Amino acid sequence: MKSISEIAAARILRSRCSAQVLRKYLKNKNFSDGEIEPLIESFKGYGYLDDLQYCRDFIVHGERKGWGELRIKRELRKRELSSENIAIAFDEKLENSEADEGNTERNRALAVALKIIRQSGMDIENKIPEKLRNRIIRRLSSYGYSSSIVFSTLSKLDEMAGDEILFDYEI
Protein backbone atom coordinates (compact mmCIF):
# COMPACT_ATOMS: atom_id res chain seq x y z
CA MET A 1 0.00 0.00 0.00
CA LYS A 2 1.25 3.47 -0.89
CA SER A 3 2.04 6.00 1.80
CA ILE A 4 0.18 9.27 2.18
CA SER A 5 3.14 11.23 0.80
CA GLU A 6 3.31 9.03 -2.32
CA ILE A 7 -0.41 9.45 -2.95
CA ALA A 8 -0.23 13.21 -2.38
CA ALA A 9 2.84 13.58 -4.61
CA ALA A 10 1.14 11.59 -7.37
CA ARG A 11 -1.91 13.87 -7.12
CA ILE A 12 0.20 17.02 -7.36
CA LEU A 13 2.21 15.64 -10.27
CA ARG A 14 -0.97 14.71 -12.15
CA SER A 15 -2.27 18.29 -11.99
CA ARG A 16 -1.44 21.28 -9.87
CA CYS A 17 -3.88 21.92 -7.05
CA SER A 18 -4.49 24.06 -3.99
CA ALA A 19 -3.84 22.90 -0.45
CA GLN A 20 -7.60 22.67 0.15
CA VAL A 21 -8.13 20.44 -2.89
CA LEU A 22 -5.28 18.17 -1.78
CA ARG A 23 -6.72 18.06 1.74
CA LYS A 24 -10.12 16.93 0.40
CA TYR A 25 -8.49 14.41 -1.92
CA LEU A 26 -6.57 12.81 0.96
CA LYS A 27 -9.68 12.76 3.17
CA ASN A 28 -11.49 10.89 0.40
CA LYS A 29 -8.64 8.38 0.49
CA ASN A 30 -9.49 7.84 4.19
CA PHE A 31 -6.48 9.54 5.75
CA SER A 32 -6.95 11.30 9.07
CA ASP A 33 -6.45 15.02 9.76
CA GLY A 34 -3.51 14.04 11.94
CA GLU A 35 -1.77 12.57 8.89
CA ILE A 36 -2.92 15.17 6.36
CA GLU A 37 -1.99 18.45 8.08
CA PRO A 38 1.69 17.66 8.73
CA LEU A 39 2.05 16.44 5.15
CA ILE A 40 0.49 19.63 3.74
CA GLU A 41 2.77 21.77 5.90
CA SER A 42 5.83 19.83 4.76
CA PHE A 43 4.75 20.11 1.10
CA LYS A 44 4.36 23.86 1.59
CA GLY A 45 7.83 23.97 3.14
CA TYR A 46 9.33 22.16 0.16
CA GLY A 47 7.46 24.45 -2.24
CA TYR A 48 5.28 21.70 -3.70
CA LEU A 49 2.16 23.57 -2.56
CA ASP A 50 2.02 27.34 -2.90
CA ASP A 51 -1.51 28.68 -3.25
CA LEU A 52 -0.40 32.26 -3.85
CA GLN A 53 1.94 31.26 -6.68
CA TYR A 54 -0.81 29.07 -8.10
CA CYS A 55 -3.07 32.16 -8.18
CA ARG A 56 -0.37 34.23 -9.92
CA ASP A 57 0.25 31.54 -12.53
CA PHE A 58 -3.46 31.00 -13.12
CA ILE A 59 -4.01 34.73 -13.69
CA VAL A 60 -1.39 34.63 -16.46
CA HIS A 61 -3.02 31.48 -17.87
CA GLY A 62 -6.46 33.10 -17.85
CA GLU A 63 -5.18 36.23 -19.54
CA ARG A 64 -3.59 34.15 -22.28
CA LYS A 65 -6.96 32.54 -22.86
CA GLY A 66 -8.51 36.01 -23.20
CA TRP A 67 -10.51 35.80 -19.97
CA GLY A 68 -11.50 38.83 -17.93
CA GLU A 69 -10.91 39.39 -14.25
CA LEU A 70 -14.35 38.12 -13.19
CA ARG A 71 -13.91 34.81 -15.03
CA ILE A 72 -10.40 34.30 -13.64
CA LYS A 73 -11.62 34.95 -10.09
CA ARG A 74 -14.54 32.56 -10.57
CA GLU A 75 -12.21 29.83 -11.83
CA LEU A 76 -9.81 30.36 -8.92
CA ARG A 77 -12.68 30.08 -6.41
CA LYS A 78 -13.77 26.87 -8.15
CA ARG A 79 -10.29 25.55 -7.47
CA GLU A 80 -10.84 26.36 -3.79
CA LEU A 81 -8.21 29.05 -3.41
CA SER A 82 -8.72 31.54 -0.62
CA SER A 83 -10.18 34.97 -1.34
CA GLU A 84 -7.16 36.45 0.42
CA ASN A 85 -4.67 34.77 -1.95
CA ILE A 86 -6.78 35.73 -4.96
CA ALA A 87 -6.89 39.37 -3.84
CA ILE A 88 -3.13 39.47 -3.16
CA ALA A 89 -2.35 37.97 -6.58
CA PHE A 90 -4.60 40.46 -8.37
CA ASP A 91 -3.13 43.37 -6.38
CA GLU A 92 0.37 42.26 -7.40
CA LYS A 93 -0.81 41.93 -10.98
CA LEU A 94 -2.23 45.47 -10.87
CA GLU A 95 1.04 46.87 -9.53
CA ASN A 96 3.04 45.05 -12.22
CA SER A 97 0.63 45.92 -15.04
CA GLU A 98 1.19 49.64 -14.59
CA ALA A 99 4.53 49.10 -16.33
CA ASP A 100 3.01 46.75 -18.95
CA GLU A 101 0.31 48.83 -20.65
CA GLY A 102 -0.14 46.45 -23.59
CA ASN A 103 -1.81 43.70 -21.59
CA THR A 104 -4.71 45.57 -20.03
CA GLU A 105 -8.11 44.03 -19.61
CA ARG A 106 -9.55 46.47 -22.16
CA ASN A 107 -6.98 45.44 -24.76
CA ARG A 108 -7.65 41.75 -24.16
CA ALA A 109 -11.41 42.34 -24.54
CA LEU A 110 -10.79 44.24 -27.78
CA ALA A 111 -8.63 41.39 -29.10
CA VAL A 112 -11.39 38.86 -28.34
CA ALA A 113 -14.00 41.07 -30.04
CA LEU A 114 -11.83 41.57 -33.13
CA LYS A 115 -11.32 37.83 -33.38
CA ILE A 116 -15.11 37.35 -33.36
CA ILE A 117 -15.49 39.94 -36.12
CA ARG A 118 -12.78 38.33 -38.24
CA GLN A 119 -14.30 34.87 -37.83
CA SER A 120 -17.80 36.09 -38.68
CA GLY A 121 -16.88 37.04 -42.24
CA MET A 122 -19.55 39.77 -42.15
CA ASP A 123 -19.10 43.02 -44.03
CA ILE A 124 -18.56 45.85 -41.59
CA GLU A 125 -19.19 49.23 -43.16
CA ASN A 126 -20.15 51.99 -40.74
CA LYS A 127 -21.61 50.05 -37.86
CA ILE A 128 -21.32 46.54 -36.52
CA PRO A 129 -24.54 44.57 -37.21
CA GLU A 130 -26.78 43.95 -34.20
CA LYS A 131 -26.41 40.17 -34.47
CA LEU A 132 -22.62 40.48 -34.29
CA ARG A 133 -22.80 43.02 -31.44
CA ASN A 134 -24.91 40.58 -29.43
CA ARG A 135 -22.44 37.77 -30.13
CA ILE A 136 -19.59 39.97 -28.90
CA ILE A 137 -21.53 40.91 -25.76
CA ARG A 138 -22.28 37.26 -24.98
CA ARG A 139 -18.69 36.13 -25.56
CA LEU A 140 -17.10 38.92 -23.53
CA SER A 141 -19.59 38.36 -20.70
CA SER A 142 -18.90 34.63 -20.67
CA TYR A 143 -15.17 35.40 -20.61
CA GLY A 144 -15.72 37.37 -17.42
CA TYR A 145 -15.42 40.97 -18.59
CA SER A 146 -17.40 43.55 -16.64
CA SER A 147 -20.25 45.33 -18.40
CA SER A 148 -18.29 48.60 -18.45
CA ILE A 149 -15.45 46.93 -20.34
CA VAL A 150 -17.88 45.16 -22.69
CA PHE A 151 -19.61 48.39 -23.66
CA SER A 152 -16.42 50.43 -23.91
CA THR A 153 -15.12 47.71 -26.25
CA LEU A 154 -18.25 48.04 -28.39
CA SER A 155 -17.77 51.83 -28.49
CA LYS A 156 -14.18 51.36 -29.59
CA LEU A 157 -15.31 48.92 -32.29
CA ASP A 158 -17.93 51.42 -33.51
CA GLU A 159 -15.17 54.04 -33.83
CA MET A 160 -13.06 51.56 -35.78
CA ALA A 161 -15.92 50.18 -37.92
CA GLY A 162 -15.45 52.65 -40.75
CA ASP A 163 -11.72 52.07 -40.93
CA GLU A 164 -10.30 49.74 -43.53
CA ILE A 165 -7.72 48.60 -40.99
CA LEU A 166 -10.30 46.99 -38.69
CA PHE A 167 -9.31 43.50 -39.72
CA ASP A 168 -5.60 44.28 -39.55
CA TYR A 169 -5.73 45.88 -36.12
CA GLU A 170 -3.21 44.37 -33.72
CA ILE A 171 -3.22 44.79 -29.95
Task: Label the model's feature ranges.
Residues 1-171:
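An alpha-helical, amphipathic repeat domain used for nucleic-acid recognition
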